[in-house]
Amino acid sequence: MRFRERQSLHLISLGCTKNLVDSEVMLGRLQSYTLTQELENADVIIINTCGFIESAKQESIQTIFHASSNRKRGALLVVSGCLAERYTKELKEEIPEIDIITGVSDYDKIDSMIAQRRSIESAKVFLADEHNERVIIGSSFHAYIKLSEGCNQACSFCAIPQFKGKLHSRTLQSTLKELTNLYNQGFRDFSFIAQDSSSYMRDLGQKDGLMQLIRAVDNLNLPISARILYLYPSSTSLQLIESIAQSKSFLPYFDMPIQHIADAMLKTMRRGADKATHLELLNAMRAVPHNFVRTSFIIGHPNEDEKAFLELHDFIESFAFDRINLFAYSPQEGTAADSMPNRPNTKITNQRINTLNKIIQSQYKAHNLALVGQEVDAILEGKSEVSEYFYKARLKLWGKDIDGEILINDSEIVDSNNQMLLLKEGYYRVQITQCKDNFLFGKALSHL
């Protein structure tokens, strides 16, 4: 008897970690396929796209064209995700080489679509729950858990509510079940994500949903580390910050994109909170022992004049965030900002970003130098992409892939013959030995 050879699958996940979770759900539905790193050899190619800002759209389109041009004869090309949701008609007309187009509603039906070689377009945005098996990408120790989809905020620059809809939270019980399932599979480090994490369960009538989650996770008494990403200023409270500070499971990690600090800009951007509120929240975060505060800013939004920029400049210089992402304003059709006047030109925007980056890089260097000589709790994640001779680690406090890397090039962990043991993913005590060219180097002292 001759058995049919398993078909091969190549998946490219673009954009944010929320998109990554959806990609992992698709892989969970397609476990009968053999994963291949070689696009040219794949029987099925899936590109889970991002369509948030212009650069993300261009990356998605270029990736689609590359896949179409380089796939083997007969290979199926599937395009999913935000770009596919926003521009279904345009993609069908302009890139007819795409075999299946599906947006953000049917990740759990990907196996049926491929089997039937046809698209499915449902109305309701998909939100993974504990019943959706995932194949976690890139780690056997860390996993993302998505709390909700959609957003009830009305930021002037953001198109997400147009294609992701209103806030749609999963239940507390669903979230806890997924956490427990992942823990039982061996995962120990978790990042909870959403478009607006601090509004979790508000659509279910719970104003303190995220605080309920923190208490419930603590009550599980699991030996884990966790952090919450994407807090929103107008839905974050001092009580929430205190809940995170007192938690035995959640780290004092505060990721709150504030986008600007000048009152005039916060109003123009429709952020729902003023400068005083932002400062109150940020100062409360800074008061938490061993805190880590991360944010993002948009530069060049309409009405950002020199006065507003200088106010932001001085604020960044004085507050010294642990991490900052800077984005040049990207016009999005259908948003309030798209029709606003007084947009700084590209040259001015780039100059402002360059000016701020100099401050930020100086602050990062100071943060890194302060770590040299310290012993820290870290998470080792495997071999580094910098070199096969280094292990890759991060402070336990840091988020995966976004906050930095420690290159481990020495270890005191040895066997009975005093031979250095191979290190596996997990918690370690690490001594930071050097900071060079923005890289931290460390020595593994013990497995925790």
Curated annotation (Swiss-Prot):
This protein's UniProt keywords: 4Fe-4S, Cytoplasm, Iron, Iron-sulfur, Metal-binding, S-adenosyl-L-methionine, Transferase
Limits of the Radical SAM core domain: 137-366
Subcellular location: Cytoplasm
Comment on bound cofactor: Binds 2 [4Fe-4S] clusters. One cluster is coordinated with 3 cysteines and an exchangeable S-adenosyl-L-methionine.
Catalytic activity: L-aspartate(89)-[ribosomal protein uS12]-hydrogen + (sulfur carrier)-SH + AH2 + 2 S-adenosyl-L-methionine = 3-methylsulfanyl-L-aspartate(89)-[ribosomal protein uS12]-hydrogen + (sulfur carrier)-H + 5'-deoxyadenosine + L-methionine + A + S-adenosyl-L-homocysteine + 2 H(+)
Record's keyword annotation contains Iron-sulfur: yes
GO molecular function: 4 iron, 4 sulfur cluster binding; aspartic acid methylthiotransferase activity; metal ion binding; protein methylthiotransferase activity
One GO-annotated biological process of the protein: tRNA modification
Signal peptide: none
Coiled-coil stretches noted in the UniProt entry, renumbered to this chain: none
A single GO cellular-component term on record: cytosol
Residues annotated as binding [4Fe-4S] cluster 1: C16, C50, C82
Residues that hold [4Fe-4S] cluster 2 according to the record: C151, C155, C158
EC number(s) given by UniProt: 2.8.4.4
NCBIfam families for the chain: 30S ribosomal protein S12 methylthiotransferase RimO, MiaB/RimO family radical SAM methylthiotransferase
PANTHER family in UniProt: RIBOSOMAL PROTEIN S12 METHYLTHIOTRANSFERASE RIMO, RIBOSOMAL PROTEIN US12 METHYLTHIOTRANSFERASE RIMO
Similarity section: Belongs to the methylthiotransferase family. RimO subfamily.
Protein's name according to its UniProt entry: Ribosomal protein uS12 methylthiotransferase RimO
Gene behind the chain: rimO
